[in-house]
């Protein structure tokens, strides 16, 4: 049985009217108060310093000037020394991993992974990585297929952005640790038309080794960002499938940062299929959620036309693209 509220029906009309008005007034005031307490999302505020695209461009030039950084070559050795010295000059803690690695063609190379750490004592960490070796063949070209490529974009651009970030870190006081991982033997994978026995997981050998043999025992990071082919004119960076599968929150973090910086024409919301790149093994072996900022066509899923060809030279490198990627990653770090 419904319980009646006593006395309301017997009150004079004007009292009831006043009471109703009072109740309405109170309810309306409560509604206004509730409306006023709804907070709008905080406006985005830039925190990172300006990324120097001229400096990054110079770092690409420096690498290409050594020649193709094919494992076992003099250019490879010289470039390794250059990267290591530059990182140490910026005051970072540097570890060089070396190990004999067998490739699909049954050759043995002395692997050189280079890891530089900013504030290594901090538990909260972000991993940034790029491969520094270049492809030993031009298997996507129609001429000189068996000759090594310059690798200005594929290899050179990612390293250049990381070196410029290292320079900025040397002057910073962040509340997060950062590890810059320069992986070796990423691009010595088995070509599709190889006459050699099929080798499983022939790509990204440096990262596979690192993930199984951490440079610091028990190392981990909150998340990782891989930079691969991030310097070409007209580059587009869709949401790559492997990263979206393993680390969707990291993809959203980076792409929303790029959007807030006005870079939506570069960092698009298109989705691509999965790729086999260093971040695959960071996710599956090291168990660190990691994404890939990589130049891909959102329509065909293929990389840039210069990929693994002799067109991958300084002629295709664009300072604006280096700026967009570098500034986005810097902002992600500074927002931490």
Cite the ranges covered by each PLM segment.
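Bacterial Sec signal peptide processing site at the extreme N-terminus
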Residues: 28-38
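Acidic/histidine-rich catalytic neighborhood of metal-dependent amide-processing enzymes
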Residues: 147-249
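C-terminal motif of bacterial Sec signal peptides marking the signal peptidase cleavage site
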Residues: 22-25
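Bacterial N-terminal signal peptides that target proteins for export
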Residues: 2-13
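A non-catalytic alpha/beta surface segment that caps or lines the substrate-entry region
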Residues: 68-121
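Active-site-adjacent substrate-binding region
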Residues: 98, 223, 230-336
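Second-shell loop/turn segments in exported
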Residues: 44-50, 65-74, 101-104, 145-155, ...
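N-terminal capping segment at the start of a domain
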Residues: 38-79, 90, 301-316
């Amino acid at each position: 049985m419904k319980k009646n509220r006593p006395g309301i029906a017997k009150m004079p009309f004007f009292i009831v009217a006043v009471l109703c008005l009072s109740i309405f007034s109170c309810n309306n005031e409560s509604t206004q108060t509730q409306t006023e307490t709804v907070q709008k999302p905080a406006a985005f505020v830039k925190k990172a310093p300006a990324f120097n695209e001229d400096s990054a461009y110079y770092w690409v030039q420096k690498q290409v000037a050594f020649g193709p950084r094919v494992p076992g070559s003099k250019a490879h050795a010289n470039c390794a020394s250059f990267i290591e010295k530059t990182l140490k000059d910026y005051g970072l803690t540097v570890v060089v991993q070396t190990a004999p690695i067998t490739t699909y063609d049954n050759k043995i190379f002395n692997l050189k992974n280079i890891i530089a750490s900013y504030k290594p004592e901090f538990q909260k960490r972000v991993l940034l990585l790029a491969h520094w070796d270049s492809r030993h063949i031009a298997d996507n070209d129609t001429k000189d297929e068996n000759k090594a490529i310059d690798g200005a974009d594929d290899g050179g651009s990612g390293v250049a952005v990381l070196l410029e970030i290292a320079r900025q870190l040397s002057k910073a006081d962040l509340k997060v640790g950062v590890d810059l991982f320069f992986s070796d033997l990423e691009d010595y994978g088995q070509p599709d038309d190889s006459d050699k026995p099929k080798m499983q997981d022939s790509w990204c050998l440096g990262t596979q080794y690192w993930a199984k043999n951490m440079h610091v025992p028990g190392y981990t990071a909150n998340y990782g960002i891989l930079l691969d082919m991030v310097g070409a004119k007209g580059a587009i960076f869709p949401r790559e499938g492997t990263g979206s599968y393993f680390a969707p929150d990291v993809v959203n973090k980076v792409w929303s940062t790029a959007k807030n910086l006005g870079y939506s024409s570069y960092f698009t919301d298109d989705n691509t299929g999965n790729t086999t790149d260093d971040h695959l093994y960071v996710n599956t072996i090291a168990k660190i959620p990691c994404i890939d900022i990589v130049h891909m066509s959102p329509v065909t899923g293929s990389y840039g036309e210069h990929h693994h060809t002799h067109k991958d030279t300084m002629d295709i490198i664009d300072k604006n693209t280096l700026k967009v990627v570098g500034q986005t990653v810097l902002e992600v770090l500074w927002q931490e």
